[in-house]
Amino acid sequence: MKQPKRLGVLTQSRAYNHAPAQEREAAKRLGGRTTPASGSLREKGDVRVSGILRLECKATSKKSFSVTRDMVRKITEAGELSGELPAIEIEFLPLAGQFHGRVAVVPAYVLNQLVTGEK
């Protein structure tokens, strides 16, 4: 993306720069693989554990992160079409004095399946 010189150098956020490493790490940890073009082509999601899980990875260095209906809809549709459980993993990047770690957002039916063991 080209921008006028008066605006200075275009820089990306820490979270944007961290995304490829986050996706690779999640794929390795979960025994899956990263999807081509980070899910922007025909295969949605960032990480796929075939037949089990479809994962969208997000990261932030801010205090909070908003999960939108559209994010949930896209990963849920992709998971349901392939018979996989949909999930969004949010990584809170290190920030002085702030929580650092990962959380997962899943539809309620996924949580029910995890607790009851039902399919």
Describe the residue ranges of each PLM region.
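Catalytic phosphate/metal-binding cores of nucleic-acid and nucleotide-processing enzymes, i.e., regions
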Residues: 1-119
